[in-house]
Structures are given as C-alpha cells and as structure tokens.
Amino acid sequence: MTTLTITRPDDWHLHLRDGDVLTDTVRDSGRYNGRALIMPNLVPPVTTTEQALSYRERIQAENKSDSFAPLMSLYLTEKTTSEEIRKAKATGHIVAAKLYPAGATTNSDSGVSDVKNVYPILKTMQEEGMLLLIHGEVTTHDIDIFDREKTFLDTVLAPIVNDFPELKIVLEHITTKDAADFVKNAGPNVAATITAHHLLFNRNHMLVGGIKPHFYCLPILKRNTHQQALVEAATSGNPKFFLGTDSAPHAKDKKEAACGCAGSYTAHASIELYAEVFENEGKLENLEAFASFNGPDFYNLPRNTDTITLVKEAWIAPETMAFGNDFVVPIRAGEAVEWLVK
C-alpha cells in the first residue's frame, strides 16, 4: 500500500461562513490542517479588528482540534484607516487584509471600486508588514468573465506591485496561465494560492453535457490550457505557489437554482484531492512544499512540526454533507477520491 507522510498542511484561503454552519465547516477544515486563513466576506463584512477577533472567537468555540488554529483577515474598504491596520497587526491574530474589487464575488459589494483610493492604506500595510490578499478580477461589464483575471493583472496588479515593492502580495486562487506567469516573473514579494478544483477541472467539466452548478465558482473555471499551466506551477516546487482551497460552501438549494451562488466545497477532502494532482504529474515529492512549507515561509510564520499520513486508498465522497440546518454538496459527491488521510 502506498503511503505518504508530510508535515501538517495549512490552508491559506478558506471560507467558514458564520452562525450554525460553523460546527460543520470548522470540523471539516480542522481535521488535518494546522492553520487556515479565514476570509472576511461575511454579511456584514469583517472590516474592523473587533469584528475579526469576535469572528475568531466564534470559530474557536466550534474548534474541537488541538492542532487547528484560525488566522484572520480584514476586509479592505475605501473607509479602512491606517489606524485600523496597525491595531489589527498588533493583535497577532490578524495577518492580512483582503482586497475585493466591488462586486467580484460572494458578498463583495463593499469592496474597492478604485484601488487608488486605498493607496494610503497599502502604504501603511507595507510599513507594518501586513500582507495584501487580492481577488484578482476586474468587474466592469464590458470585460468578458473569462478575461477578467488577465485584465486585472495588466491594469490593477502590475501598478500595485510597481508602486509598493516591499508589500507582500498574495494573488488568490489564480486561474490562468497569465496569472501563473505574472507571479513567476514578479519579485520575491508576490505569491499565489491555487485551489484543488482549478487544478482538477476546467470549464468543460462545468458546461459539457449539462450545467454542473457545483463547479461554478469565481474566478470561473477556464479552458484546459490554463488548467495545465496551473498544474505545472503548483507541482513545480516553485516556492511562490502554495495551497489555498477557497473552499466556499453554499446550501444545496442555493447552488442548484436559477441564479446559483458561486463557490465549490472541497474542505472534506482537500489534501486528498491535491495529492491526486501531484501523483498524476509524477510530483508527489513536491506536495509537502506546496501544502506545508511555501505558505508559512511566505507569511514569515513557523512551519508546523507534526505530520499527517496519506494512504493510496479510494473512498467515496458523500452525496451531501451537513451544513447547519441544511446540506452542502461537496466536490466529487458520490464519486471516488483516490487518497485517504489516516
């Protein structure tokens, strides 16, 4: 039987939601992750230090794992102050601020309409050593949804990188060859997270033979040439790329609807799904760096010191999983997952 023991991984991009669903989402993500960076796009968004610490307390109240710790982020708005950034940084629990272009994804209406409006805040973040996380898509209606990431790189991200060379930036959940190349060619302060579903699937999986709403996420799945570029980046051993699931649950009826929500749920099997990708590429030896080393190294945090063991043993993912008083349909629902965490 094939086994693989790696340093305990972290998830550098996770949605836990809030309220009664935390019992389920914290359980799923806390099974084997050491840390998870929690996204702030609640309703209302997590824009203050007090809100972030209160949210952390609600998460910890449901946390049954001694080895799992949530790291928090602030939702960056055009009303965010430098004082708030300094206060957040001083807590030791809030490690980043997230830039959402207004309207780019779930609960992003409070986001930034013009990045120049937050330049004073980015200057403070650069001075304080707080990381900037970016949802890298433009939101103007004249730009095709499949081109929004590429346009963002050229018109928004490149100027930020140029104007704030000491600011550490994570381009979240990249979906294109263009984004992978941008990160590779940028300086040492630019990195990216990559999701399991963008490595495993492309837009054909979502659209051919009927619309598959549980593959619908933002940024949207792209063509297979972009998928393969992401696989190459993730499995290459390049320290600029690391694990961020963007596991984003919505209740079953909110996905299977005339106007369904964006987000795919992978927290039930995240490291197992990544292992499939690395095995398929013959790069299992690089999984540990991607999942367990590159993220904490970029964040200047210590690596986890304990381990988990994966076994090459297929199991069937559940058709649905508990999500508070409702249900979520996970990726690979009713289908085989090739690896199992023992």
Swiss-Prot record:
GO biological process, one term: 'de novo' pyrimidine nucleobase biosynthetic process
Alphabetical list of PROSITE patterns matching this protein: DIHYDROOROTASE_1 (PS00482), DIHYDROOROTASE_2 (PS00483)
N6-carboxylysine: modified positions: K98
Pfam families for this protein: Amidohydro_1
InterPro entries found in the cross-reference section: Amidohydro-rel, DHOdimr, Dihydroorotase_CS, Metal_Hydrolase
CDD domains to which the protein is assigned, alphabetical: DHOase (cd01294)
Cofactor: Zn(2+)
Protein name in UniProt: Dihydroorotase
Cofactor binding note from Swiss-Prot or TrEMBL: Binds 2 Zn(2+) ions per subunit.
Pathway involvement of the protein, from the record: Pyrimidine metabolism; UMP biosynthesis via de novo pathway; (S)-dihydroorotate from bicarbonate: step 3/3
Family classification: Belongs to the metallo-dependent hydrolases superfamily. DHOase family. Class II DHOase subfamily.
Lineage: Bacteria, Pseudomonadati, Pseudomonadota, Gammaproteobacteria, Vibrionales
Subunit-structure text: Homodimer.
Enzyme class: hydrolase
One GO location term (cellular component): cytosol
Residues that hold Zn(2+) 1 according to the record: H13, H15, K98, D246
GO molecular function, one term: zinc ion binding
Organism the protein comes from: Aliivibrio fischeri (strain ATCC 700601 / ES114) (Vibrio fischeri)
Keyword field: Hydrolase, Metal-binding, Pyrimidine biosynthesis, Zinc
EC number: 3.5.2.3
Annotated binding of Zn(2+) 2, by residue: K98, H135, H173
